[in-house]
């Protein structure tokens, strides 16, 4: 039943506290999973106080439990341990605080953790977050390298020393964070966001040395994994040793087996690059020298050819050829004219020999009647017919007798 109140008739604090206690007590006992922090075992008290923190969100809940319940868990109940508790939420009106009264605590064993990680891995894989197609290539020579690692850790030393040994001019943007425990995920997320916003940082390395499954749990946190996927800058995962495989290895753009391997993957080796440049220069020099020698030989061959060794020699030869052709054509033309002239003389002689005038010149005469017809037989004329006689010197009239 909702409470009613007015400015003139306000409710006292005890009423509100009692109502809150009644509402919260209706929830009953529930199973809750979280990470243990701030364990307080006060001497002479049978109650142990601790804080149960959500491993993903920045949310915590105060927990009270009998000392016997904590002792039953054994030495595994330490800060950072993942547990499942069974308890009932309670509200203390006198202090106005909310707490979870726990009657059973179960450590979350490695098998259960691995099963949960496998389920999360399957979910992220189904979303395509592990796909090679979405992974970005690292820059060849980054201007600045972002490094997220533990404070004064061996991983920090390995990455920085190896990176600067390989490329002394590399600039490291270091962000020191907690790499295990309840604060690790939030600090890593803040450092990742800070470095990703810096345009000068071209690659980010998240590094940590080896550890137990529980120690490496922050690097399998779903919030961190999705932040790495959404980052603009390529991310290199360098967590633990070769055998350690947190889920960060699957979503990162590059997975390095160790922090030292991450330094080798992020920046090139100056000595190797110098040797490579020198080898390429030598190769280019050899190729260019070979090409020059080839072109030099070709030029020498061209210069040795007669047409280039003595350019006028060919002209002189051509001139002699033209002169010979002219003389030959002149001789041929003269011979042809002489032959044609002789043929013309012979033809004229034959024509003259066959001409009637030539016959008349030999003393013959041509007799024609009055009609001009040539008389070939005496029978063709009669006595007294007028005739015309043609001789070589001309014609005269005659009469048949």
UniProtKB/Swiss-Prot annotation:
Subunit comment for this entry? Answer: Heterooligomer composed of large and small subunits.
User: Has keyword Transcription regulation?
Assistant: no
Q: Can you say where in the cell this protein is located? A: Cytoplasm
Q: Could you tell me the Gene Ontology terms of the biological process aspect for this record?
A: DNA catabolic process
**Keywords in alphabetical order:** Cytoplasm, Exonuclease, Hydrolase, Nuclease
Q: Which family does it belong to?
A: Belongs to the XseA family.
Specify the enzyme's EC class, one word. hydrolase
* Gene name of the record: xseA
Q: Which HAMAP family match?
A: Exonuc_7_L
> In the record, what terms sit under GO molecular function?
exodeoxyribonuclease VII activity; nucleic acid binding
Which reactions are catalysed by this chain? Exonucleolytic cleavage in either 5'- to 3'- or 3'- to 5'-direction to yield nucleoside 5'-phosphates
- The EC number(s) attached to this protein equal 3.1.11.6
Task: Tell me the Pfam families matching this sequence.
Answer: Exonuc_VII_L, tRNA_anti_2
* Reported function: Bidirectionally degrades single-stranded DNA into large acid-insoluble oligonucleotides, which are then degraded further into small acid-soluble oligonucleotides.
Q: Which CDD domains match?
A: ExoVII_LU_OBF
UniProt name for this protein? Exodeoxyribonuclease 7 large subunit
């Amino acid at each position: 039943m909702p409470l009613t109140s007015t400015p003139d008739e306000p409710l006292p604090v005890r009423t509100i506290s009692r109502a809150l206690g009644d509402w919260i007590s209706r929830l009953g006992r529930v199973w809750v999973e979280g990470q243990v922090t701030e364990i307080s075992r006060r001497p002479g008290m049978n109650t142990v106080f601790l804080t149960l923190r959500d491993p993903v969100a920045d949310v915590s809940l105060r927990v009270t439990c009998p000392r016997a319940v904590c002792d039953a868990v054994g030495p595994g109940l330490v800060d950072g341990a993942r547990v499942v508790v069974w308890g009932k939420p309670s509200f203390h009106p006198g202090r106005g605080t909310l707490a979870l009264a726990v009657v059973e605590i179960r450590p979350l064993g490695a098998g259960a953790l691995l099963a949960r990680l496998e389920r999360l891995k399957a979910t992220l894989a189904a979303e395509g977050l592990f796909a090679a197609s979405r992974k970005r290539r690292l820059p060849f020579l980054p201007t600045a390298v972002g490094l997220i690692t533990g404070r004064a850790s061996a991983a920090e030393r390995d990455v920085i020393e190896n990176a600067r040994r390989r490329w002394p001019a590399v600039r490291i943007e270091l962000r020191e964070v907690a790499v295990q425990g309840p604060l690790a995920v939030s600090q890593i997320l803040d450092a990742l966001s800070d470095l990703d916003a810096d345009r000068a940082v071209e690659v980010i390395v998240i590094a940590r040395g080896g550890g137990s499954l529980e120690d490496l749990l922050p690097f399998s946190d779903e919030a961190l994994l999705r932040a790495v996927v959404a980052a603009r800058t390529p991310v290199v995962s360098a967590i633990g040793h070769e055998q350690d495989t947190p889920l960060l290895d699957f979503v990162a753009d590059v997975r390095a087996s160790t922090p030292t391997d991450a330094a080798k993957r992020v920046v090139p080796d100056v000595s190797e690059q110098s040797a490579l440049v020198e080898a390429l220069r030598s190769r280019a020099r050899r190729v260019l020298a070979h090409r020059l020698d080839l072109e030099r030989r070709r030029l020498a061959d061209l210069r040795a050819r007669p047409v280039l060794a003595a350019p006028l020699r060919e002209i002189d030869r051509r001139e002699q050829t033209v002169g010979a052709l002219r003389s030959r054509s002149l001789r041929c033309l003269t011979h042809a004219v002489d032959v044609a002239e002789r043929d013309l003389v012979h033809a004229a002689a034959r024509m003259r020999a066959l001409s009637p005038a030539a016959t008349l010149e030999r003393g013959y005469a041509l007799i024609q009647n009055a009609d001009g017809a040539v008389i070939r037989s005496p029978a063709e004329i009669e006595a007294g017919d007028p005739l015309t006689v043609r001789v070589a010197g001309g014609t005269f009239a005659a009469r048949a007798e």
